[in-house]
Amino acid sequence: MKTYQIVIKPLTGFGTPLKGDTLFGNICWQIYYDKDLLGKDLETLLSDYSTNPFCIVSSAYPYMDNKNNKEEPQIYLKKPSLPLHFLFSLPEEELVQKRKELKAKEYFVYKPPLPPLSQIEYLSSDDIIIVKDEQVRCTIHRLSGTTSRGGFAPFVVPKLWYITKLVLFFGVREDIPIEGIIEALKRIGKFGYGRDATAGWGKFEVLSYEEIDFYANIRQTENAYYALSPVVPNKSGNYAEIFYEPFIRFGRHGDVLSASPNPFKSPVLMADEGAILIPKKFEKRIYVGRAILGVSSIIEKAVHQGYSLVIPVEVSYDKIQNNH
């Protein structure tokens, strides 16, 4: 499997966060309607998805190219899901005093080779500028021509604005053309992604893509994996420890199936992006996780992305063992 870095530019607000598992579903719909995109139809691509995934999609992360300063572009990843005393080398008393301040630090700059996670500088979300907004809507009573009480009362819809450019990471099987994935992504960006795409939300532009290797520039002391999207760890992964924030995906079918008698999928409990997986024996892995089956009551073969691309990181595992 090859890995790619894709830079996109948000053009509107978003009703649905750009998470890897949801974006994977959008790409599947593009392949369903145009089998020439990847040279194979969707059913063929999903036939061995449990053992040989054709595509793995990461969540989106802030990307700043700093063209005016001629500096290298900076990618901001989510703070790892580890207890504070594993992320900050501070005395316990100071950790308690600064707990709120430290918890507000939500990102770090991804610049390989990464130092140990306890030596990274973490930044607050204010430094990244991702704005959450609300839009007031109302339903018009067709008899009175006005809003009213109950189901016709004004209501608030949350909206997310990505102020910076964004970067996505894709894992693509070697027999799959990356050009087809890029074209699918362009179509999604043109017509809109997620909730309220028909109202003009969720539009973006694909700016560039390039092949990358997460293991090309490392310190050789890495001992853990950082998940780039929500993941369901494989039971046979031989992990010594897994640290994560739980994320429940209340999924629903898209496209024409959104109007089916039962558009809702079964809930899936996942480890959110930023999860840290510590294997008993560290080895080079491009991705972790597994396919999620049985999520739909109307389509037996429906799958959900439980895979995640990973970045090698170094965790003070001796410190973790001493605290357990």
Locate the predicted segments by residue.
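Conserved active-site/ligand-binding neighborhood in enzyme cores
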Residues: 1-324
